[in-house]
């Protein structure tokens, strides 16, 4: 079974247990003889995907208890296997969603870590810097690189901590493992979105035929 999670920069695939990533340009050239079950948040690819007979869109099959308007299918899929907890998907944006008794209580969005860098560099060339991923969040910074890093990482940390209260934290996405290290008992699951997709297919076995 081939699953595909299409974003704005990349398309991530899970082929049984084999995980791989294609750029959007590579994805447009991708050919396969078996069915591909996908979710997609890339507006530019919607027409292309409609014309691909082997591609099966899973989005219409998700029944998700939320009053949030415009919740992305990637966020829905990431939350779909979680009954209670906070789901953090840390990619080009960082999304934080709160689930209680399988009900989505709401969520919020931050820039991704790479985009914080771009924001700083647009403010001033002097703020163009790599981040110090080892910066202490328990001591005030004494140089610009650490000050930028502290501002980003401590801000993200405090917002997630405040949202989590005593709930379990589930991290996914490219920066998910890094952010999970700031929290005790956090779970990093690279395949969280794919688990949601697999659950949908299990609930709708006719999709396989």
From Swiss-Prot:
One GO MF term, please? ATP binding
Put simply, this protein is called Type III pantothenate kinase
Q: Tell me, what does this protein do in biology? A: Catalyzes the phosphorylation of pantothenate (Pan), the first step in CoA biosynthesis.
Cofactor comment in the record? A monovalent cation. Ammonium or potassium.
Species whose genome carries this gene: Campylobacter jejuni (strain RM1221)
Q: Which residues bind K(+)?
A: 89
Entry binding sites for ATP: 5-12, 92
One GO cellular component this record assigns the protein to is: cytoplasm
């Amino acid at each position: 079974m081939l699953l595909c999670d299409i974003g704005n920069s990349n398309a991530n695939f899970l082929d049984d247990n084999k995980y791989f990533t294609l750029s959007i340009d590579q994805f447009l050239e991708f050919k396969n003889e078996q069915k591909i079950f996908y979710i997609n948040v890339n507006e530019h690819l919607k027409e292309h995907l409609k014309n691909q007979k082997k591609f099966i869109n899973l989005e219409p099959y998700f029944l998700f208890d939320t009053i949030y308007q415009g919740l992305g299918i990637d966020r829905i899929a990431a939350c779909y296997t979680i009954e209670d907890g906070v789901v953090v998907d840390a990619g080009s944006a960082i999304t934080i969603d709160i689930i209680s008794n399988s009900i989505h209580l709401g969520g919020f969005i931050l820039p991704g870590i790479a985009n914080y860098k771009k924001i700083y560099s647009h403010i001033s060339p002097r703020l163009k810097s790599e981040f110090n991923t080892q910066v202490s969040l328990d001591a005030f910074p004494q140089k610009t690189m650490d000050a930028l890093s502290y501002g980003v990482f401590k801000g993200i940390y405090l917002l997630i901590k405040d949202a989590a209260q005593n709930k379990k934290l589930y991290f996914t996405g490219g920066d998910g493992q890094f952010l999970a290290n700031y929290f005790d008992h956090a779970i990093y699951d690279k395949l969280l979105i794919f688990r949601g997709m697999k659950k949908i297919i299990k609930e709708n076995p006719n999709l396989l035929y």
